Amino acid sequence: PPPPPRLDSSAASDVYKRQLSPKLRDLMPDPRGLKDLERAAARLNAAVKAKERLAIFADYDVDGGSSAALLLDWLRQQGRDATLYVPDRIDEGYGPNVPAMEGLAADHDLIVCVDCGTLSFDAIGAAKAADVVIIDHHLAEVELPSAFAVVNPNRQDETGELSHLCAAAVVFMVLVEANRQIRADSQAPPDLMGMLDLVALATVADVAPLTGLNRALVTQGLKVMSSRSRPGLTALADVAGLDTPPAAYHLGYVIGPRVNAGGRVGRADLGARCLAATDPDEARALADRLDELNRDRREIEAQVRDAALTQAEARGLDGALVWAAGEGWHPGVVGIVAARLKEATGRPAVVIGLENGEGKGSGRSVPGVDLGSAIQKIAAEGLLIKGGGHKMAAGLTVKSDQIEAAMTRLADLLSRQGAGATGPRDLRIDAALMPGAATVDLMAQIEAAGPFGQSAPAPRFAFPDVQILHARQVGTGHLKLSFGDGLGARMEAIAFDGWTSPMGEALSQNRGQRFHLAGRLGINHWGGKQSVELRLEDAAPSG
């Protein structure tokens, strides 16, 4: 057979540069390609010019909070503001509801729904006294709500080219067009580049793929964030003890969970208010409260996680779907627990909290399996009270006596997508290292190839045949490990929530024994010094 085609050196160099140094100017499409976007931008500008009364209805997660903060920043740079409304997860549930929208429409001229609203037909219809603009990314049906504009790359009549964007990125696209219209009117528009820190946070926290446009948004957003110019993000980094320039990892695992904590186990609007804060003292007070709630969330999550895993194991982990449901499980942590089950089994997972004959659940999927469309289908079939989402994450509400039937049907639909054909969760190893080779210089080279995240994973290393020197519990159930190569080189490893896991038990009970270890590398900052640590994912006896 003929040899495969090869890139010439110039083309290869261009590919290399686009991956390592993606530029927004090279990857940013014309926002007007999205349906209703130009109309939505014009309506926003008209509201600002006429000094209309504005309200923002935002989802209670990081993407919703970041989207709301983006809009508020843009408005405030023009001397305007808006009422912020974030629904209570338990009392109101996801998305716009009739009482809230009727109330907002009574004393506002324009309501902008961000990261929600695409399936809220009754609630949008109830807001007749105001115009409603929806900026969302969740899967839509053929029919759309009766809003002034619905900007959503996952509308059925869209091309799908931008379906990977989170809601905050879609809001950013709307504001790019709004700024274009402002410049066309010979006015100076707000600074959008300085808002990319919020877009980066939402993109990573919502597990959007870090490829193409998303990669450029996150790369630039991390640069903006390192300037510590946004009081809310600065305060969140400080309460988390983050004293280095942030990486994508910190957005997903350090800052993101704290922003989410208010919507999960506290007051729903705390995260959005912290991100939108302009006063450093207010931002710090909100960040402190979110940090406290995040600690509460961890304790609640641990209880639900243990019960859900026990139930799922009893039901079986070899099907197309792993699921669990329990009375009194906090609806604010079921999504995190579903993510833990998905990570542990390599299969789509759904976890449902039951109360008063009704279950509220959340699901997480694996690459190549569209969970959102499957849940939307069983909702249309009448097995759910409601349900929807996107490919990798979705939510649902179901009657308690319908759970078995709904999960059976969902498993069938996911099996048709190939979910049941996946084998045991294997780790892909990129290279083998010894402790002495895991240096700060190596980490600098790895980080230069970032940002890493969904669809752009950081390299995973195996440390073969190393000796376990010490294992102990740190924090709330984390495993801290020291290991060496027997030649004098040693390093530290950490497995979050790993102390009571089978891996944690094996390592803590076999001090002095030799194991193969695998995971990704990170930098540990302690006492003014830097060292490389292994974020441990798996271990096996080497003998």
What are the residue ranges of the model-derived segments?
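Short, conserved micro-motifs enriched in small and acidic residues
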Residues: P2, R6, D61-S66, E161-A169, ...
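Histidine-centered active-site/metal-ligand motif
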Residues: P2-P5, H137-H138, P153, H330, ...
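Hydrophobic helix-and-loop "lid/oligomerization" segment in the mid-to-C-terminal part
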Residues: S13-D109, A129, R180-Q402
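Mid-to-C-terminal polyanion-binding domains and interfaces
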Residues: A50, G212, E282-A324, V369, ...
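Short alpha-helices
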Residues: L70, P145-D185, L192-V204
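Histidine/acidic-residue-rich, glycine-tolerant segments that coordinate divalent metal ions
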Residues: V114-C166
